[in-house]
């Protein structure tokens, strides 16, 4: 099984194997998840100061903020063209 990496915007790359969910930041429960992650020190802000459009939740309980739409991240996850690298273990 290889490690799949996906671009989440501005040159930031995340391991696709570790993703649990890609969601929109608009709802109150997601805003609470973001605040709780910030309080625990588990929040990664990859927006470069831009508006948060996608919230990525990983299996390690890290919460990653991205300025790319959730649909775009999901599309990059599902296509081979946007996979940055595959490494065989």
Swiss-Prot record:
Pfam families: RemA-like. Transmembrane segments: none annotated. InterPro entries: RemA-like. Disulfide bonds: none annotated. Belongs to the RemA family. This is Putative regulatory protein CLL_A1210.
